Amino acid sequence: MLVLSRRAGESVVLGEDVVVTILEVRGDVVRVGIDAPRSVRVHRAELLAQLEETNRQAASPSEDVIANLARALDHGTGTDPSS
């Protein structure tokens, strides 16, 4: 990991078209501005981790959902519109 020291108003250039600027430093909070093309996805790491966990949970149905589906299939109570 590259570690840099920057003051408010100073920037770092990533690649050819991403500029990260330190806007303000107040105590232990740093405001950062990111200038990047729309094609570059920029996410806060904690929100990305939360989104990944939510997606993982959504992709894994609960045992109750699976059991209810199995019962419906066994009893022929599906939602087939032709029945």
Curated annotation (Swiss-Prot):
Gene: csrA
The protein's role, per its UniProt record: A translational regulator that binds mRNA to regulate translation initiation and/or mRNA stability. Usually binds in the 5'-UTR at or near the Shine-Dalgarno sequence preventing ribosome-binding, thus repressing translation. Its main target seems to be the major flagellin gene, while its function is anatagonized by FliW.
UniProt keyword list: Bacterial flagellum biogenesis, Cytoplasm, Repressor, RNA-binding, Translation regulation
Native species: Nocardioides sp. (strain ATCC BAA-499 / JS614)
Name this polypeptide is given: Translational regulator CsrA
Single GO MF descriptor: mRNA 5'-UTR binding
Origin organism lineage: Bacteria, Bacillati, Actinomycetota, Actinomycetes, Propionibacteriales
Cellular localisation: Cytoplasm
Domain of life: Bacteria
HAMAP family: CsrA
